[in-house]
C-alpha cells in the first residue's frame, strides 16, 4: 500500500511539474480554455447568450483568480497525498503535520525556481504563498480527520 501512496505523490508532483513546464502562452491558453468551458456551461444552463465582447471581459477579469485557485488546488491535493503517505509511518500527529508542510513548501519553492527557466514564465514568492495556502488547507483538513479517528 505504501508503494501506491508513493506513486500517487510522485504522479501528482509530475503533474505540477508538467503545468509549470508550460510556456506562458500555453499556460494562459489553458486557463482561458477552462474559463470559456465554464462560461459556456453556465450560459446553457441559464439559457442566456453573451457577446464576444462580454466573454473577453469575463476572461480578463477571471483569468488571474482562476490561475491562483489552480495553485491552491494543486498543492491542496499534494498535501493530502503527502499526509496520507506519512500517516502510514505511524508518526505522531505533530510530525505528520510538520513533515507534510515542509515537503510541500520545498516542492513549491523548487517549482517556482523551475519556472525561471521556462519561456515567458517567472518565479514568484507570492505564488509560493498561494501554493502553501493550499498545502496548509490540505494538511489541516486531513489531520483534523486523523485526529477524529
Language-model regions, residue ranges each:
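"…centered on the first transmembrane helix and the immediately adjacent amphipathic helix/loop
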Residues: 1-73
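Interfacial helix-loop-helix junctions of multi-pass membrane proteins
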Residues: 108-129
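Membrane-interfacial alpha-helical segments at the cytosolic side of multi-pass membrane proteins
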Residues: 75-88, 133-147
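Small-polar-interrupted transmembrane alpha-helices in polytopic inner-membrane proteins
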Residues: 12-13, 96-115
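Membrane interface segments of multi-pass transport proteins and intramembrane proteases
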Residues: 41, 45, 87-92, 146-149
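Membrane-interface loop-to-helix entry segments
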Residues: 64-78, 125-133
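Membrane-water interface at transmembrane helix exits
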Residues: 18, 70, 83-87, 111, ...
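Membrane-helix interface segments
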Residues: 2-4, 91-99, 121-125
Amino acid at each position: 500500500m505504501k508503494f501506491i501512496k508513493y506513486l500517487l505523490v510522485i504522479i501528482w508532483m509530475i503533474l505540477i511539474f508538467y503545468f509549470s513546464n508550460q510556456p506562458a502562452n500555453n499556460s494562459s491558453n489553458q486557463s482561458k480554455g477552462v474559463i470559456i468551458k465554464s462560461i459556456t456551461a453556465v450560459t446553457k444552463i441559464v439559457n442566456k447568450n453573451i457577446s464576444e465582447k462580454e466573454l473577453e471581459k469575463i476572461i480578463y477579469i477571471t483569468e488571474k483568480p482562476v490561475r491562483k485557485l489552480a495553485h491552491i488546488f494543486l498543492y491542496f491535493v499534494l498535501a493530502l497525498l503527502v499526509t496520507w503517505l506519512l500517516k502510514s509511518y505511524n508518526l505522531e500527529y505533530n510530525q505528520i503535520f510538520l513533515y507534510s508542510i515542509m515537503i510541500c513548501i520545498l516542492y513549491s519553492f523548487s517549482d517556482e525556481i523551475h519556472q525561471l527557466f521556462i519561456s515567458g514564465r517567472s518565479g514568484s514568492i507570492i505564488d509560493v504563498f498561494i501554493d502553501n495556502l493550499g498545502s496548509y488547507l490540505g494538511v489541516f483538513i486531513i489531520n483534523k480527520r486523523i485526529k477524529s479517528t
